[in-house]
Amino acid sequence: MKKIHRTLSLFTVAAMCTALLCSCGEVPDSSQTDSSSKAATTTTADTTADTTTTGEASSTASVTSAPDSSVSDSSSAVTDDTKTNGITPAMWKVTSPEGSTMVMLGSFHALKDECYPLPQAVTNAYNNADILAVECDITSTSEDGEYMKNLMKQMLYNDNTKLSQHISEEAYSALQTYLGYWGMDISALEVYRPWAVSSTLDTLLIQDSGFDSEKGLDNYLLTTAHADGKEIYEVESVDFQMNLLINFSDDIYDLMFRSYEGETKESQKQALEDLYTAWKSGDIETFLEEDNEEELAGYTEEDKKIAEDYNNQMLYDRNKNMAKAAEDLMSQGKNVFYVVGAAHYAGEGGIIDLLEKDGYTAERVQY
């Protein structure tokens, strides 16, 4: 069994929305944070909130060699300047029973400069596709002022209650201790709903660990696709992902916050770095390694049910829909580059497993 999978909440839209809200001033008072967390918040707003595309569509355009939102060149076309950086993310060529094919890639939603230029195999898969399929197109939402205004309202309690009334004393205490490592006081978060607190902490963790959501693989490919005029297919939507976060029960967030017990800023950064290292080598199974009995110590039977519910909603239920979307696209003969989070492909109940059970074959791409 797997404990509640906090790292699965680190998908692009959560960080993007928190970053936009930071830029709008809708985050805890910066006086409650130390210099490092102030810097992280500022960086998040600067690098993630202004996700724009540049250049005109070109029939010869291709994936750029490195993500740079400041580029204003009239074309996104580049050379195939591939460096040897050891980045070999998991990628498959999937073939349907009827013989149609699709290239599928496992993404990591926040990356570092060292990941670019992309490996040639990834560049080729993008350039050869007519359609880029992603979880959701966050670049279109970042400029929607009305959407962000409504989202900001949902961050806050509007019934005169506060965070401490919605989670247990144990969860509150664990969260308070963990916030201390970030130089934050929990009192600054009392008016925020649990999903907003969680997303804010995720964003701080991403930035303080040296990652950049704007350089995340999906965001980079989306920006490039818009510049190239390439068709984009949303497997889900921003609304779907945000509603998923917003509608998780207080019990789920209570368990999530209790999981901070014994954690520090450094331990969380190391956990994220371990996942990143696994992603770079194409080791997707690391994302879903089972916890041993020692790691599950302290989990009641009710906790295990809550964790299972969360993991099903965040991962396995979505995997089914993602696999179905891939099958639909292949049945239409679409030439698609299919890019969703790496964890969605892993293990039993992952996209590859589901496709193989439906008679599809999946061949791992070798770099």
Question: What does each of the following model-derived ranges do?
Answer:
Residues 2-4, 89-90, 118-120, 323-324:
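A generic local structural motif
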Residues 3-28:
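Sec-dependent N-terminal signal peptides of Gram-positive bacterial secreted proteins and lipoproteins
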Residues 22-33, 37-49:
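Bacterial lipoprotein signal-peptidase II cleavage site
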Residues 31-32, 38, 60, 71-77, ...:
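Phosphate-group recognition and catalysis centered on beta-loop-alpha active-site segments
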Residues 52-94:
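N-terminal low-complexity, Pro/Thr/Ser-rich intrinsically disordered segments
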Residues 79-80, 90-310, 314:
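Structured, acidic catalytic/metal-binding patches in enzyme active sites
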Residues 85, 96-97, 330-332:
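Extracellular/periplasmic catalytic domains that process cell-envelope and extracellular macromolecules
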Residues 303-367:
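A cross-kingdom marker for long, charged
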